[in-house]
Amino acid sequence: APVVDDIDVALWQKFCLFAPMSGVTAAARCTLGDIKRDPHLNRLYKDGLAETAALGRALGVALPDDIETIMWDRLSGLPDSLRASTAIDIEAGRALEVDWISGAVARLSQDHDLDAPVHRTLNAVLQLWKDGRA
């Protein structure tokens, strides 16, 4: 694994990529290819990414100014068939970690007077399956 200068930045970069991917692929039952190609899913992902980055900055994480572009470029390089584990879990009827992903972004954003409508909505949609369903 590469050595990083600031572990908080590295963790938040990963969270910026993953949090909207998790929520969108689970709620829409889609792949990254769908997010890349569909303008509605594309916008939903990018807005969720911006919300996550804004929260990281509000928490004092020194994210790069162009984090949204960096993470979109990273997502664009991932296989189209990829889905977040949350999407796989929902289809398998397993419990979801939504409270710690989109739920956390929504909750912490509210605590810091930030609006996070994408994560608030993804959290609300996915709550129905939070405890799993067979």
Protein language model regions, located:
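Internal alpha-helical scaffold of NAD(P)-dependent oxidoreductase catalytic cores
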Residues: 1-66
